[in-house]
Design a protein with these regions (language model features):
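Polytopic alpha-helical membrane-helix bundles and their juxtamembrane interface segments
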Residues: 1-253
């Protein structure tokens, strides 16, 4: 097994153990919960930068723009994690939501969405239009169903909540589902190809973000979220998978 994959598995296992036994070190867990995300997000940024360096030709090249989009998206998500850590660890704001961290995270979706869209559009010719359309319709219906399923309990918790907070709570899963849909289309296109592994990893990463943000939205609306909540593992694992996906892409294509 290649070293990056082994390290990722060991890291994921260590994270699961840390969260499982957090009652034994509750004070330290608060620090870890807020300090670790910028670190793992930074690792993902570095992995995307290596990809950008490999594929960069000139700004007019679509592949250069795609990897620039990946990198910019990860940078903004890293900034979101960093701002959250500053709020919690330096400014003593226990749960900074909504905050400037959300601005950075939401901005990050724009370059990521563009990169995913361009990637799919660039290579969709490799499968028949019939298969592509069938896949797009199926993925769209599944995504809509998941969003509708999530929206029901959110609407039930909306009473008395700030409009901005509720809007952000809805925006995250909606944007995650859009990325998830594009990732599945890319996986459909590249199944059996050299970069199928990369897009499989990205698909899993985006799905973890979908579930993680749905749970975060519900728990913040219900007032049950806390620093060190097990749902944070989904975001940690997602960053690990993105970093691995960028690595796999560089090695296979």
């Amino acid at each position: 097994m290649k070293t990056p994959y082994l390290v990722s598995i060991l890291l994921a296992a260590a994270l699961a153990i840390i969260y499982l036994f957090q009652d034994q070190y509750a004070d330290q867990m608060y620090l870890f919960s807020n300090a670790f995300p910028p670190v793992i997000a930074a690792v993902t940024v570095v992995s995307s930068i290596y990809g950008l360096m490999k594929y960069w030709g000139k700004l007019e090249d679509k592949f250069s723009k795609i990897w620039l989009g990946f990198t910019l998206g990860m940078i903004f998500w890293f900034l979101g994690e960093l701002f959250w850590a500053i709020y919690t660890l330096l400014l003593n704001v226990e749960i900074p939501f909504p905050s400037i961290a959300d601005v950075a995270w939401l901005i990050g979706y724009a370059p990521m969405m563009i990169a995913f869209h361009w990637y799919v559009r660039t290579f969709q010719f490799t499968i028949s239009k019939k298969v592509y359309r069938a896949g797009a319709i199926t993925i769209g219906l599944v995504s809509f169903g998941l969003f509708a399923y999530f929206l029901t309990p959110v609407l039930a918790e909306m009473a008395g909540k700030e409009v901005v907070a509720v809007g952000i709570d809805i925006a995250y899963p909606a944007l995650d589902l859009a990325l998830f849909g594009y990732a599945l289309l890319a996986l459909l296109i590249f199944t059996g190809g050299k970069i199928a592994v990369a897009w499989a990893l990205i698909s899993i990463a985006t799905f973890m973000d979908v579930v993680g943000d749905m749970l975060f939205s519900l728990t913040t609306l219900q007032g049950t979220y806390y620093n060190g909540h097990p749902l944070e593992l989904l975001f940690h694992f997602s960053y690990i998978l993105y970093a691995l996906a960028f690595y796999a892409h560089r090695k296979e294509f």
